[in-house]
């Protein structure tokens, strides 16, 4: 039963990460799996589950604060291209994304669809 609960938790983490960020599902899945594994190991060794939960919540709050305080706005077309290129693993895709964002603006929407046309 614990394995099924853990699997459902990891699945939910991946889905929520994809819904919110659209990226990072692998990292979120690995972190969730490690938290579940270590949490169960600690509970089996006698740790208080509520204490573990509170500790995890405090850690999440601290990590979130640290990430937000070190975050930088991406404003220029060049910064967008560089960031998107790193995320896509392909600078030409980053350049296309920056071009599309330049055309639609900050509040615009860009829809990407798979095509059956090769090379276009």
From Swiss-Prot:
<dbReference type="InterPro" id="IPR027410">
    <property type="entry name" value="TCP-1-like_intermed_sf"/>
</dbReference>
<keyword id="KW-0413">Isomerase</keyword>
<protein>
    <recommendedName>
        <fullName>Chaperonin GroEL</fullName>
        <ecNumber>5.6.1.7</ecNumber>
    </recommendedName>
</protein>
<dbReference type="InterPro" id="IPR027413">
    <property type="entry name" value="GROEL-like_equatorial_sf"/>
</dbReference>
<keyword id="KW-0547">Nucleotide-binding</keyword>
<dbReference type="GO" id="GO:0016853">
    <property type="term" value="F:isomerase activity"/>
</dbReference>
<dbReference type="InterPro" id="IPR001844">
    <property type="entry name" value="Cpn60/GroEL"/>
</dbReference>
<keyword id="KW-0346">Stress response</keyword>
<comment type="function">
    <text>Together with its co-chaperonin GroES, plays an essential role in assisting protein folding. The GroEL-GroES system forms a nano-cage that allows encapsulation of the non-native substrate proteins and provides a physical environment optimized to promote and accelerate protein folding.</text>
</comment>
<keyword id="KW-0143">Chaperone</keyword>
<dbReference type="Pfam" id="PF00118">
    <property type="entry name" value="Cpn60_TCP1"/>
</dbReference>
<keyword id="KW-0963">Cytoplasm</keyword>
<keyword id="KW-0067">ATP-binding</keyword>
<comment type="subunit">
    <text>Forms a cylinder of 14 subunits composed of two heptameric rings stacked back-to-back. Interacts with the co-chaperonin GroES.</text>
</comment>
<dbReference type="GO" id="GO:0042026">
    <property type="term" value="P:protein refolding"/>
</dbReference>
<dbReference type="GO" id="GO:0140662">
    <property type="term" value="F:ATP-dependent protein folding chaperone"/>
</dbReference>
<dbReference type="GO" id="GO:0005524">
    <property type="term" value="F:ATP binding"/>
</dbReference>
<comment type="similarity">
    <text>Belongs to the chaperonin (HSP60) family.</text>
</comment>
<dbReference type="GO" id="GO:0005737">
    <property type="term" value="C:cytoplasm"/>
</dbReference>
<dbReference type="InterPro" id="IPR002423">
    <property type="entry name" value="Cpn60/GroEL/TCP-1"/>
</dbReference>
<feature type="binding site">
    <location>
        <begin position="23"/>
        <end position="27"/>
    </location>
    <ligand>
        <name>ATP</name>
    </ligand>
</feature>
């Amino acid at each position: 039963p614990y394995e099924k609960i853990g699997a459902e938790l990891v699945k939910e983490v991946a889905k929520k990460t994809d819904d919110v960020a659209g990226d990072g599902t692998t990292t979120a899945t690995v972190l969730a799996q490690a938290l579940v594994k270590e949490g169960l190991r600690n509970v089996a060794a006698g740790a208080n589950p509520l204490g573990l939960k509170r500790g995890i919540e405090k850690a999440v709050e601290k990590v979130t604060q640290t990430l937000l305080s070190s975050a930088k706005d991406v404003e220029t077309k060049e910064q967008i291209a560089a960031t998107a290129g790193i995320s896509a693993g392909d600078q030409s895709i980053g350049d296309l994304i920056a071009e599309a964002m330049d055309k639609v603006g900050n509040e615009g929407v860009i829809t990407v669809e798979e095509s059956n046309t090769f090379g276009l």
